[in-house]
């Protein structure tokens, strides 16, 4: 058999080299095929309709919902603060026969009220109702300056019955000397007991005044404690379904941390023209020497800027 020189059997070394080359070729081919498969699967994973991207959608939706809820909460708080931060144009105040009114577009929008206690003695409420009085704030009780006992105002029931019979809407106020939240809640419970069964048509007010002449038990409380007491009182009253107010003059109210006390303010200042405070207020007690038919003594007069706080009987 004739063998061509070029077709001679390969040597052992040539066989080993060819085997190694074939092995490398096999690995290259395998890598190419595996790479193509990987590329195909990789492209599939990055497709817009990929399963793992679909799983991210609920997370993104949840984040959007949380952002929307946070925005709603912030807007609600802002609106609440705006409702308390009332602004008035004092040029709209009108003065007539010792009384002050507030008008908008030529129409009187305010209400005129009195606040009374045992200091006014016996009151002819029918005569009061005929003298342009729209509502009354009646003192229902007090806490003692020193020992801290609770007392009902001795004319409270008579005044409440008289106002109700005469058709005058009324609220009540309590003179507080609470030194902690527990006592403030006790005062609120006492008020609720006193007004049980009555038609309370106006807010219930928390009245804490500085009494330096009497060395009163609540004189030296911190702003933090006074604010906590007021909130405890107001929260209990609101739980019972009533609206609330905080009463005081500039000095009294400066004792509170008003940034953390989001209640309506009943402000006292007797300058006879307009309030000079920057404190947001809804009612202004503008004199302690008012004259009203049916009351033999001087009486406090008030202008209520938000008539919605008085509910007809």
Give the positions of each predicted feature.
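Aromatic-lined carbohydrate-recognition surfaces of secreted/lumenal glycan-active proteins
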Residues: 237-254
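Structural recognition of alpha->loop->beta junctions
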Residues: 192-212, 257-280
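Hydrophobic membrane-insertion alpha-helices, especially the h-region
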Residues: 60-81
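Sec-dependent signal peptide cleavage junction
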Residues: 75-94
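Functionally critical loop-and-helix segments that line ligand-binding/catalytic clefts
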Residues: 4, 90-122, 126, 260-313
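Substrate-binding cleft of extracellular glycoside hydrolase catalytic domains
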Residues: 106-232, 238-240
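N-terminal targeting leaders characterized by basic, low-complexity, disordered sequences
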Residues: 1-51
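Short, low-complexity patches enriched in S/T/P/G
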Residues: 48-64
